[in-house]
Amino acid sequence: MKKEDLRIVYMGTPDFAVEALRQLVEGGYNVVGVITMPDKPAGRGHKIQYSPVKQYALEQNLPLLQPEKLKDEAFVQALREWKADLQIVVAFRMLPEVVWNMPRLGTFNLHASLLPQYRGAAPINWAVINGDTETGITTFFLQHEIDTGKVIQQVRVPIADTDNVEVVHDKLMILGGKLVLETVDAILNDTVKPIAQEDMAVVGELRPAPKIFKETCRIDWNSPVKKVYDFIRGLSPYPAAWSELVSPEGEAVVMKIFESEKIYEAHQLPVGTVVTDGKKYIKVAVPDGFVSVLSLQLPGKKRLKTDELLRGFRLSDGYKMN
């Protein structure tokens, strides 16, 4: 079968999912339909906002479905009428069997980790938070349990000590697009040899990648320098690590922290103590040193570098982070 004859249905929603779709379209593959999340109001004006995948699909005049429920009979029938040979899922949602089992060649997913590591909703964040020096991208066939299907292909990607989650996300997004094409070609040429995840060699324990909530993002200043540093970059720029900045009078304000620096220095200060010159730097005491805050944001304000914030916000010794 030629690639032009292979009928592909593509499912995805955020920016991360646009790259693979773009590479499929520009590569001359036959994308017969796109499925994305329903439109949602966003921002202060609650204006209806299209998902990045929908925006791209409209630009390319691709047929589009936006089901509220994936088991809805009308949606399932519309999907069936596209007569897909293969379905590709990138950053979408959990599919019911009636959907993933429909195409004759199956449905494969692009997952932003080296499965079986980091199964779950936030694999890129957790790899950086945990201080990993390597992650990767995986294509695998869908089956009943989430992120457990047979692995088709993987690509490894280094994580630099200075990388935040945005940098790693963008690396994986580009490589993921290429891997989707390679996986489609392997399926077309019947050269796929899927490997069960339980048969794959794993170094160390399996780590999950659960969804991240606001409380997940609160900084624990009782952690070592390196752990706090990794935590901040693993949540930067979104959803952002945060802490309560408490004044000597006991007034607290939530502060988001986007960028930091490690300082290994012995001290006798209580954990969470803020050390500042009021002009250039803010350091927070942790058990084995300090975390220097380089970029931050106060409620209702824009993100600023520390010296910019200190020009308009009076901060002195006596403050602490909670």
Curated annotation (Swiss-Prot):
Keywords: Protein biosynthesis, Transferase. It catalyses: L-methionyl-tRNA(fMet) + (6R)-10-formyltetrahydrofolate = N-formyl-L-methionyl-tRNA(fMet) + (6S)-5,6,7,8-tetrahydrofolate + H(+). InterPro entries: Fmt, Formyl_trans_C, Formyl_trans_C_sf, Formyl_transf_N, Formyl_transf_N_sf, Formyl_transferase-like_C_sf, Met-tRNA-FMT_C, Met-tRNA-FMT_N. Transmembrane segments: none annotated. Gene3D superfamilies: Formyl transferase, C-terminal domain, Formyl transferase, N-terminal domain. (6S)-5,6,7,8-tetrahydrofolate binds at S113, L114, L115, P116. It is an enzyme of class 2 (transferase). GO terms for cellular component: cytosol. It holds the Pfam family Formyl_trans_N. GO terms for biological process: conversion of methionyl-tRNA to N-formyl-methionyl-tRNA. One of its GO terms (molecular function) is methionyl-tRNA formyltransferase activity. Its EC number is 2.1.2.9. Belongs to the Fmt family. PANTHER family: METHIONYL-TRNA FORMYLTRANSFERASE, METHIONYL-TRNA FORMYLTRANSFERASE, MITOCHONDRIAL. Attaches a formyl group to the free amino group of methionyl-tRNA(fMet). The formyl group appears to play a dual role in the initiator identity of N-formylmethionyl-tRNA by promoting its recognition by IF2 and preventing the misappropriation of this tRNA by the elongation apparatus. NCBIfam families: fmt. This is Methionyl-tRNA formyltransferase. The gene is fmt.
